[in-house]
């Protein structure tokens, strides 16, 4: 058995995990918060260690975003470094996956942000992509993270 983690490092990013629980596939998705990310990854790393499971993460490879400016690019890079630091510290293997690569896997290259939400609804219809109970709009960051976890399950 394995645990697959997907990480969308954007400002409205998220983290997701796909794992097995007594033979049943489960999915966990959480919005972005630095401390939540640490506890999320640590919980799954502990689970993997206890059960002799492998754990791997697919992290979206980030680059400069046109129109973000210098401060925005710096913060984006700082966040990406934080993610890699946490995964390395917890000894969770990871790969940086360019957006075009994982999107090609789900045939959504060049489509708008709602495309990943539609993929998740098709693959995991019971999973909520609402950041909070009060939200009405599904999070494309949570959908991207779940797609990255699904990509990891298929390819890593």
Enumerate the language-model features and the residues they cover:
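Phosphate- and other anionic-substrate recognition elements at nucleic-acid/protein interfaces
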Residues: 1-156
């Amino acid at each position: 058995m394995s645990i697959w983690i997907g990480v969308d490092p954007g400002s409205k990013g998220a983290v997701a995990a796909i794992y097995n629980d007594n033979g049943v596939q489960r999915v966990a998705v959480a919005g972005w918060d630095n401390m939540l990310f640490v506890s999320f990854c640590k919980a799954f790393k502990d689970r993997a260690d206890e059960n002799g499971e492998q754990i791997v993460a697919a992290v979206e490879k980030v680059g400069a975003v046109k129109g973000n400016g210098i401060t925005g690019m710096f913060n984006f890079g700082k966040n990406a470094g934080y993610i890699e630091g946490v995964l390395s510290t917890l000894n969770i293997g990871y790969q940086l996956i360019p957006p075009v690569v994982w999107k090609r896997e789900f045939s959504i290259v060049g489509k708008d942000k709602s495309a990943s939400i539609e993929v998740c609804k098709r693959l995991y219809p019971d999973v909520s992509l609402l950041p909070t109970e009060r939200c009405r709009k599904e999070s494309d960051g949570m959908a991207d993270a779940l797609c990255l976890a699904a990509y990891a399950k298929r390819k890593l």
